[in-house]
From Swiss-Prot:
Gene: rplF
Organism: Corynebacterium diphtheriae (strain ATCC 700971 / NCTC 13129 / Biotype gravis)
Name of the protein in question: Large ribosomal subunit protein uL6
Gene Ontology biological-process annotations: cytoplasmic translation
One GO CC term, this protein: cytosolic large ribosomal subunit
UniProt-recorded Gene Ontology molecular function terms: rRNA binding; structural constituent of ribosome
Subunit structure: Part of the 50S ribosomal subunit.
Lineage top rank: taxon: Bacteria
Amino acid sequence: MSRVGKAPIAIPSGVDVKIDGQHVEVKGPKGTLDLTIPEPIVASIEDGQISVVRPDDHRKNRSLHGLSRSLVNNMVVGVTEGYTIKMEIFGVGYRVALKGKNLEFSLGYSHPVLIEAPEGITFAVDGNTKLSVSGIDKQKVGQIAAIIRRLRKDDPYKGKGIRYEGEQIRRKVGKTGK
């Protein structure tokens, strides 16, 4: 049995879960998320908990078991608490500003870079070098944060770029002159 897959998911108060065959819908105070579970995996509600089971121990079913349980758990956490990723910008002249719901970056290019907020994602800017990406869908929040980070990846020589808060960059020593 999968250690991740066999653990039941507690349904907090204020969260409504509907399971219709392979389709799972989770409603909570922050919004609604839905997911289609892969075919051999079955989800059910028992005693205020969601349990995810697999029919047999085939290799594919074992891998889908833990995945499906984690995705459903991420939905429950998302509609109750939400997800936030904080980021920092390092570099002279590098800054970010909130323009309506979108982010405008000044990253040393000849033009400002604009990132539009997809549905369900909100941006917050603290000062002009710190920002946070928030939403209820863990995958969307992480994807947008990765797209923002990719705009100007950290330079190992100068330490300039966009990074996640608390991320340590391995610095390199430059060439030594003769």
